[in-house]
């Protein structure tokens, strides 16, 4: 079995590689979103950029702090091996919650994209109050989680006696610092863990349900729109559904090991070092799903790769008229 030192040596190389490749991917797709999104889809453009921003925050915080969740200790401790280990403990503890929030926020942005696409596909303008109600329900888990995390930061890391205790613990920081502990006897922690876990599981369920309804609607209206438009709509839906499954695929396996460690207090180094890194992997794959499954972006990539030979006039038409 790899030792703690083996994991550290690997992650010293992997963290910079992951940061650079993820940021390049995110900046690349943001360029496409800002420059090649049709004008009639500006709201979706903001949602897509929002998703990218949260994923950039997630990856950057992971690299800066390089957390290790020492699950076999009671109470459970969170250590930092990154440059952030030199910060005061409450800063690291706050960034720990930022990482968790970013995971939920980027997933909720995908759900918002699905809702806007569903609304556009039905071609029915919802009343303002009904639209606000749906958006509020979508955002409620995120707002609740952020509120609970603010409470935890204020109560678990900001009191002077706690700050002084961690200053003494980290007075001679070398390879890592202790940024905080996780106390699951605190109600706010319990509720927040439930929100985080249930949100990741619910995203694919919502996605599959929306997929079924969207494809049914596309099928019903297939005789009123072109075959090309139908294909574009189906392709977009497939891409968004795939994006809803990414957090589940990367979050659930490592979280299952995490909950096992909470119950048994067993030391599993892989879980401790990768608990925050693996859920950040969608930030690397998400941009390429967006580029492939959204028609205007895919067409532009093909033009750059000389897979599509079109005149300048045709390029303009693609940017203006292509839909998701």
From Swiss-Prot:
Q: Which keywords label this protein?
A: Membrane, Transmembrane, Transmembrane helix
One GO cellular-component annotation of the UniProt record comes to: membrane
The record describes its membrane topology as: Multi-pass membrane protein
What protein does this entry describe? Serpentine receptor class delta-41
Give the source species. Answer: Caenorhabditis elegans
Q: Where are the transmembrane segments?
A: 13-33, 47-67, 95-115, 134-154, 186-206, 239-259, 274-294
Family, per the entry?
Belongs to the nematode receptor-like protein srd family.
Whether S-adenosyl-L-methionine counts among this entry's keywords is no
